[in-house]
Amino acid sequence: MERKLMSLLPSISLSEMEPNSTLGNHNSNRSCTTENFKREFYPIVYLVIFIWGALGNGFSIYVFLKPYKKSTSVNVFMLNLAISDLLFTITLPFRVDYYLRGSNXIFGDTPCRIMSYSMYVNMYSSIYFLTVLSVVRFLATVHPFRLLHTTSIKNAWILCGVIWIFIMASSTVLLKNGSEQKDNVTLCLELNSNKVTKLKTMNYVALVVGFVLPFGTLSICYLLIIRALLKVEVPESGLRLSHRKALITVIIALIIFLLCFLPYHVLRTLHLLEWKADKCKDRLHKAVAVTLALAAANSCFNPFLYYFAGENFKDRLKSALRKGRPQKTRCGFSVCVWLKKETRV
C-alpha cells in the first residue's frame, strides 16, 4: 500500500482508472455498459492517432537526428517528446484490437500491462517535457546570457534523463496490474471496484503533481511573457525572434493542455467520485472515454509544436527533404559561360 502511494504520477493513473463498465458482478452488469460505444469509437480514433502519430513523430525524430550545423537544448527536449509519443503510438494497434473484440484481450497478460504503462508514461512525460520547454523558452527571453550554461546540450540531456527516470519509475506499479479472466473473456484496462477508494486518493496526488502544478507553471510563463513583451520596445520589423518563439511555444503547449489533458483529468476525477458499483452512468462513462482519446491525441499535436516553434526545425526539414533530390551539376565560370553561348537560341 505504502509503496503504491509513493508512486506519484502515472502510478496514480492505473489501468483500472480507464472508463469501464465492469460494475461489480460481471454478468449482471454487461448490459449496463458503454461497450458498443467503445467498440465503435476507440478503434477509429486510435487508428487515426496511430497513423498520424507514428508518421509525424517518426519523421520528426528523423529530422532531429540528422546532422546539422547547430543544435540547442530546445531540440533535445523536443526529440525526447517525439520519442515518447512514438513509443506510445506503437501500442495503439493492441488497443484497437482489444476494443474491436468487445473488450477481450487475446495477446496475453504482458501486452495488457504495457498498454496501460505506455499510456500514462506518455501522458505525464509529455506534460513535463512541454512544461520544461516553455520554462526554458521563457527564461531565454528574460535572462538569455545568464542561462547560457544552464541550458547547455549536456544539461538538457541530464534533465531529460531525470524526467524519464522519475516518470518510468513511478509508473512501475502499472506493470503489476494485468489482465483478468471473467466469463471466458480476458478483461484489460478495466476499473476494479475493490480499488476505487484507494484510487481516489492516488488520483488527487496525480491531479496536483501531474497536471495542476505544470499547468500553473505554463500559465505563469504565458503571463510573464506577455508582460515582458509589453515592457520591451518592439522594433518595427516585429517581435524579436526569441520572444516570438517563446510565445508560440507556450501558446501551443497551453492549447495541448486545455484540449488534451484538462478534460481528462477533470472527468477522471469526477468519474471516480461518482462511481458506485450499483449504478450505471453511461453519459459519464462515454465522456471519460472521449477525454481519454483526447489525452492520447496529444501525440498528434506535438509535431505542430516542432514545426512552428522548433529551433531550426524548418531548416532541418528542408535539408532532409533536399537529400533525396538530384543535385544540380556545378561547373566552373568559363565552362558555364561557354554552355550558355552554345545553347542560346
Curated annotation (Swiss-Prot):
GO biological process: neuropeptide signaling pathway
Disulphide bonds in the chain: C112-C188
Function recorded in the entry: Receptor for cysteinyl leukotrienes. The response is mediated via a G-protein that activates a phosphatidylinositol-calcium second messenger system.
Membrane topology: Multi-pass membrane protein
Top-rank lineage group of the source organism: Eukaryota
Protein's name according to its UniProt entry: Cysteinyl leukotriene receptor 2
Gene3D superfamilies: Rhodopsin 7-helix transmembrane proteins (1.20.1070.10)
Subcellular location, record wording: Cell membrane
Residue intervals annotated with topology Cytoplasmic: 65-73, 146-154, 227-246, 309-345
Glycan attachment sites: N20, N29, N177, N184
Family label: Belongs to the G-protein coupled receptor 1 family.
Extracellular side stretches: 1-43, 95-124, 176-205, 268-287
GO molecular function: cysteinyl leukotriene receptor activity; G protein-coupled peptide receptor activity
Major location (coarse): membrane
